Amino acid sequence: MTENKCPVTGKMSKATAGSGTTNKDWWPNQLNLNILHQNSQLSNPMSKDFNYAEEFKKLDFQALKVDLYMLMTDSQIWWPADYGNYGPFFIRMAWHSAGTYRVGDGRGGGSFGLQRFAPLNSWPDNINLDKARRLLWPIKKKYGNKISWADLMILTGNCALESMGLKTLGFGGGRVDVWEPQEDIYWGSEKEWLGDEREKDDEELENPLAAVQMGLIYVNPEGPNGNPDPLGSAHDVRETFARMAMNDEETVALVAGGHTFGKCHGAASPSYVGPAPEAAPIEEQGLGWKNTYGSGNGDDTIGSGLEGAWKANPTKWTMGYLKTLFKYDWELVKSPAGAYQWLAKNVDEEDMVIDAEDSTKKHRPMMTTADLGLRYDPIYEPIARNYLKNPEKFAHDFAAAWFKLTHRDMGPISRYLGPEVPKESFIWQDPIPLVKHKLITKKDITHIKKKILDSGLSISDLVATAWASASTFRGSDKRGGANGARIRLEPQKNWEVNEPKKLNNVLNTLKQIKENFNSYHSKDKKVSLADIIILGGCVGIEQAAKRAGYNINVPFIPGRTDATQKQTDVKSFAVLEPKGDGFRNYLKTKYVVKPEDMLIDRAQLLTLTAPEMTVLIGGMRVLNCNYNKSKDGVFTNRPECLTNDFFVNLLDMNTVWKPKSEGKDRFEGFDRETGELKWTATRVDLIFGSNSQLRAIAEVYACDDNKEKFIQDFIFAWNKIMNADRFEIK
């Protein structure tokens, strides 16, 4: 009998570690806590003390750019360059890396190098981009840790544009690679590629998605669901680009500028194309879409299914795309791969496109249905014609839109690295004034804390206001947070979750403390309202801990500044408004998504782990920080006292819980013996006793010997959120 045979039956085992039916298979609606623990050090091959920003400083940036410029025309036999130039190919790679960003939740984008992993590495819209990254591998190998894949892909796109005649706006490094697929990103619910279950009856795209079909970056180039309707396509383009925070001018500039370069590939039927990288045979070594038609590359390449270039000279920045778009009438045809596209009629010789491999052959320019949307849409058309008349404006606006496209998910400009960071700041970067004054000292902090204590503001007012200011932070695109004190500005000051009337009273009191301090001290020392708001939270927590019998000091680091309304794009910040905030037991309305799932989503955006989320919920409840002073989940008889009462009473078997509403959104807890009503709760509260993982964590904080641990862990998690946007101190 061999080791891997059953001693009874003698049969070979098929099982390996991690295989078999999973908990998710048995209980598909199970709460997904895994997204709170992705990207741990256990999956990271770099050492714990690895600092990418410090490594980037060692990079010979100009030498790297020279190598990238040389690569553009260094055609390889295994994947020859169209027109002898990889530039257009690399622009597509960079665009498709950054273009997955969506403003709704800040997820996607190019900041983590996600194109290397599933599902993006195998999306139909990313066909053959695996080869682009392989072409880059020798350069990545050469420069190693000094340049991340995420930075390299975007910089390569920049170099491609520059090598073909466009002056770019610049480049900011600082994108840190991850080492595994990201489970937190909702790409849609479809089970098949190019499935379309995401548009409602009114044709509005499901939030937060920014692509019309599964596996596409934006839209179907053939038209909506493959229907060659230019106006319908323009509708899709407008909606998807808006979901990426682009306006109509930026959209036209990006489409027209991007399609100035390169060609589409549809030499033959897609049936010749093998599986995507994730499903490819092991001997292909991570490459996918093996093409058995002809040579499998060059003129025989099969990609999107469309075939041809948009204009003559596809490797030079010219006005050819817009000239061709408006100069000719277009006829609907099908490519050799069977895809709908449009060919120009009666083309002048000067506008014919030389073949990508054989210079003796020429082809008519082609357009996608989406391209024709720029010509026939009543909003896009005048914008496009204006660019046609103003080449310099077109080049400038494309460069600006490209910079925004490739940097939108990086957060504030303080995170940008390298010698090509533009001096100009942009409103979409959520600018914050630089510190130009001396910061307050420990003595000053003590003085201000006493003023806050004497102000008459309650513990819950102080803590809730600090939370409201800081908890807008999103780890996805590094937006939001307490720095800037934008809680006092539109739109945040009028968000329902912030209880505007109460917020205004608190802010006015804190503002007076700030003004009194600044007027008393010399002009070279100041304190910002942003700092005082967070310091107020520290005061509240310290007082609540003192009431529980613990003298603790909540860490505080000054250095925040106050942004102005002019520096704040109201429309852009509106997307940060919480639809639900489980930490304040707030839900704007009833949603299809369960409140506990919304809590996990928000915790992930806040970069919290499951234990951090749990301890914060327990602390916020006993500190009485619920929206509108709701008693749901306030499982304590001593509110504003920092105790572990939430966990102790949640896990008390003397309480019986019963739904209070038909939808099981709210619950009542009764004494098991007397039937007396003890507590009320929401789903967010009860999930910490219902879910086995969260209950296990809750049990830790309910233990008699962990009362102080609860306080220390709460302060640690609290401080993490208060400083989430303080990139300069990390």
Swiss-Prot record:
GO terms for biological process: cellular response to hydrogen peroxide; hydrogen peroxide catabolic process. The active site is at residue 96. It catalyses: H2O2 + AH2 = A + 2 H2O; 2 H2O2 = O2 + 2 H2O. Keywords: Heme, Hydrogen peroxide, Iron, Metal-binding, Oxidoreductase, Peroxidase. Formation of the three residue Trp-Tyr-Met cross-link is important for the catalase, but not the peroxidase activity of the enzyme. Its EC number is 1.11.1.21. Its cofactor is heme b. GO terms for molecular function: catalase activity; heme binding; metal ion binding. Signal peptide: none annotated. One of its GO terms (cellular component) is cytosol. SUPFAM superfamilies: Heme-dependent peroxidases. Residues 1-21 are annotated as: Disordered. It comes from the Bacteria. Pfam families: peroxidase. There is a cross-link at residues 95-218 (Tryptophyl-tyrosyl-methioninium (Trp-Tyr) (with M-244)). InterPro entries: Catalase_peroxidase (IPR000763), Haem_peroxidase (IPR002016), Haem_peroxidase_sf (IPR010255), Peroxidases_AS (IPR019794), Peroxidases_heam-ligand_BS (IPR019793). Bifunctional enzyme with both catalase and broad-spectrum peroxidase activity. Homodimer or homotetramer. NCBIfam families: cat_per_HPI (TIGR00198), PRK15061.1 (NF011635). PANTHER family: CATALASE-PEROXIDASE, HYDROPEROXIDASE I, BIFUNCTIONAL CATALASE-PEROXIDASE. Belongs to the peroxidase family. Peroxidase/catalase subfamily. This is Catalase-peroxidase. The lineage of its organism: Bacteria, Bacillati, Bacillota, Clostridia, Eubacteriales.
